[in-house]
Each structure stands twice: as structure tokens, then as C-alpha cells.
UniProtKB/Swiss-Prot annotation:
Keyword Amino-acid biosynthesis attributed: yes
Role description: Catalyzes the isomerization between 2-isopropylmalate and 3-isopropylmalate, via the formation of 2-isopropylmaleate.
EC number: 4.2.1.33
Protein's recorded name: 3-isopropylmalate dehydratase small subunit
UniProt KW keywords: Amino-acid biosynthesis, Branched-chain amino acid biosynthesis, Leucine biosynthesis, Lyase
Length: 193
């Protein structure tokens, strides 16, 4: 069972690039592992680190004021490119629980949900307002009421009912299927006889 997602409070990191693909999120050389953990240190690897593996001081996630952020605000078409579940694993392992973008690649969006992260689609103006808040400001994301709250603003969002319920209850596909166990058994009995 996944951890239910009702509300999340955290700080914001901003990476407003458009078309960030899964290879930029987690480069292919790190995909040999099958565990879901340990990928956070490779998140945005080619941007976060210089050739000598020192942190790139100009990369937003390396800003000391943004370290430990759990909400990522980004551009359009986030998670495009090849389908790899390692990308949401890397984001989650780094500590992100919420990704706010102008849009997501479909498979990436579903993989976020399947891994207990909340991907939120918001327009550019709203994302820019969120991106402009002072570092270390706590932002609250309330999935139940579909609202993002700062000390000065409230921003409403919407999410498909099925995904919302799944996250609120912390259900994975097997647990959802098991809710229909009696119907499945009933069907199997009809088919067998």
C-alpha cells in the first residue's frame, strides 16, 4: 500500500525549462538498477554536476536556499521522451512529493501517480507566481480540497477523480482490483459453469 496523500507542506524548487525529458531527469547510464531507491543522487545529473562531480553552483536545485525542497515548479511538457519509471523514482527519492508543470507526458504523469507523487497541471501565470515566492516559504498542497496555499495566495487545481481517490487512499492497482474481488469471483463462476 502506498502512503495516502492528503496534504503536503514543503518548500519550492524552480526549474522552469520546457520539455524536460526523462533522460534529463535520470540519464540512461543509471537505469541498470531495479530498486526504487538510490536514484535521487542522479536526478538531473548532467545539469546538477560539473565534470569533476562537483555541484554546479548555477543549477537551481543546488541553491542552498532551495535544498530540501519537496515541491518542484517546472515548465511545459515535463517528463517527455522515453518511458522510464526511473524518472519518478529519482524525483521521489530526491524528496519531491509534488510536481507542478504546464503539462506532462501521459506515461510520466501516470507513473508519478503510481509512485505516490502528485503531478499538478497549472497555467504559466500561476506557476510564475508560485516560483516567485521567497525561498524557504512553506507551501501547502491540499489534495482533498484541490488547492495550493501560500501565506498570501490560494491557487485551485483539479485532478481526475480516479487519480485523486487513489492518492487520497494510498491505493495501488492491485489494491484497487481487490476492491472488486467478489465481482471477479462471481464472473469467474459464471464463465467456468
Amino acid at each position: 500500500m502506498m502512503e495516502p496523500f492528503r496534504t503536503h507542506k514543503g518548500t519550492v524548487a524552480v526549474l522552469m525549462n520546457d520539455n524536460i525529458d526523462t533522460d534529463q531527469i535520470i540519464p540512461k547510464q543509471y537505469l541498470k538498477r531495479i530498486e526504487r531507491t538510490g536514484f535521487g543522487k542522479f536526478l538531473f545529473d548532467e545539469w546538477r554536476y560539473e565534470e569533476d562531480r562537483k555541484e554546479n553552483p548555477h543549477f537551481p536545485l543546488n541553491d542552498p536556499e532551495r535544498k530540501g525542497a519537496s515541491i518542484l515548479i517546472t515548465g511545459e511538457n515535463f517528463g517527455c521522451g522515453s518511458s522510464r519509471e526511473h524518472a519518478p523514482w529519482a524525483l521521489a527519492d530526491y524528496g519531491f512529493r509534488v510536481i507542478i508543470a504546464g503539462g506532462f507526458a501521459d506515461i510520466f504523469y501516470m507513473n508519478c501517480m503510481k509512485n505516490g507523487m502528485l503531478p499538478i497541471v497549472m497555467d504559466k501565470e500561476t506557476r510564475e507566481k508560485l516560483a516567485a515566492i521567497e525561498a524557504r516559504t512553506i507551501v501547502e498542497v491540499d489534495l482533498e480540497n484541490e488547492v495550493i496555499m501560500t501565506t498570501q495566495h490560494q491557487f485551485h487545481f483539479s485532478i481526475e477523480k480516479m487519480w485523486r481517490e487513489k492518492l487520497l487512499k494510498g491505493l495501488d492497482e492491485i489494491e484497487i482490483t481487490m476492491q472488486y474481488e467478489e465481482y471477479i469471483q462471481e464472473y469467474e463462476e459464471k464463465v467456468v459453469h
